[in-house]
Amino acid sequence: MERKERLRAGIAAMGLDISETAQDRLLVYVDLLKKWNKTYNLTALRDEEKMIVHHLLDSLTLLPHIEGVQTMLDVGSGGGQPGIPAAVCRPDVQITLLDANTKKTAFLQQAVIELGLDNVRVVSGRVEAVSDVRADVVTSRAFAELADFVSWTVHLLKDGGYWAAMKGVYPQEEIGRLPQDVCVEKVQRLDVPGLDAERHIVILSKR
């Protein structure tokens, strides 16, 4: 199966409505990851098929959970997941990509330019030290334990906003260690076509 067909089939299986133009840009993003990976150490994956599954389809599971938001912060964005795929598919959402690794933020800047993502801003720095970002939703993929993720980013969350943490196996123990003033709105299992591993998204809010 050609990569375009593989991506299209995965998106269809997930029940998402993503334009052909956006799908083409997602594949350009994979090309950029492959091109710059040796220089910036962006991903351990080398196989394009695995990149489509792990970096595109896995990131796109976030889309149903950011309906109606205007601003999003992707913390520990690394090579741009889930922020860049989300930005490609949701040009109406202003997205900030934050990472402390300057090599990775250099790549993110390059990717934003080459993909023409006018809705994306890249910030380099430690999340605790950032103060000029406020978002309706703060997300991360495999960034930190939930309690740390929440405490490090609470100052960046708008009133009425929420956290969307992308996790692997159901994080029962991490949920148990959350502070009292954080409410677990939802934990949903995610199905990623072609991925033989558990995925969950944890939606949290301030009480």
Curated annotation (Swiss-Prot):
Enzyme Commission no: 2.1.1.170
ATP-binding recorded as keyword: no
Protein residues bound to S-adenosyl-L-methionine: G76, Q81, V127, E128, R141
UniProt key word DNA-binding: no
InterPro entries given in the database record: rRNA_ssu_MeTfrase_G (IPR003682), SAM-dependent_MTases_sf (IPR029063)
Source organism superkingdom: Bacteria
A Pfam family of this chain: GidB
Function per UniProt: Specifically methylates the N7 position of guanine in position 527 of 16S rRNA.
HAMAP family named in the record: 16SrRNA_methyltr_G
Protein name, UniProt field: Ribosomal RNA small subunit methyltransferase G
Source species: Neisseria meningitidis serogroup B (strain ATCC BAA-335 / MC58)
Gene: rsmG
